[in-house]
């Protein structure tokens, strides 16, 4: 199920979704245990620095396996991606949601970058 569909479903069910970053196995485990206790869906967010630390493939495998092991509904999200290239890598790795942060660019470059990310997302998600 796509993230937008999940969010609509959760809204109808009067559920909130916890969106939180994880940086390693230990923080991921804590998030999953807490979400499991209250049976809450979770959006597992990764930043460039956490991807650099864990490796993209390893981070995705840990997140997916964790959601499965804890029997949780959830997704993987790129939080404050700094480049179109990183967004592409994350989408190729199976992220269901991405966010680009082009705030340090000029307004024109920000709009151009955001449009590229939207185009990529529509293809993958």
Spans of features found by a protein language model:
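Glycine-rich, positively charged N-terminal anion/phosphate-binding segment
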Residues: 3-4, 25-70
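Conserved small/polar residues in nucleotide/adenosyl-binding loops
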Residues: 123-125
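Hydrophobic faces of well-ordered beta-strands that scaffold small-molecule active sites
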Residues: 17-21, 42-45, 74-79, 98-100
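Active-site-adjacent beta->alpha loops and helix N-cap segments on the catalytic face
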Residues: 52-60, 82-85, 104-120
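Glycine-enriched alpha-helix->loop->beta-strand junction motifs that scaffold or abut catalytic
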Residues: 38-40, 92-97
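Active-site beta-loop-alpha junctions enriched in small/polar residues
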Residues: 23-25, 47-49, 79-83, 103-105
């Amino acid at each position: 199920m796509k993230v937008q569909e999940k969010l609509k479903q959760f809204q109808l069910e009067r559920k909130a979704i916890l969106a939180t970053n994880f940086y390693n196995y230990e923080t991921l485990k804590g998030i999953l245990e807490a979400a499991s206790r209250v049976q809450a869906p979770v959006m597992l967010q990764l930043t460039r620095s956490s991807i650099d630390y864990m490796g993209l493939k390893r981070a995705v495998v840990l997140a997916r396996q964790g959601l499965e092991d804890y029997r949780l509904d959830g997704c993987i999200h790129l939080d404050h991606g700094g480049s179109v290239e990183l967004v592409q890598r994350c989408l190729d790795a199976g992220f269901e949601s991405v966010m680009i942060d082009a705030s340090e660019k000029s307004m024109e470059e920000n709009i151009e970058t955001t449009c590229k990310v939207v185009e990529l997302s529509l293809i993958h998600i």
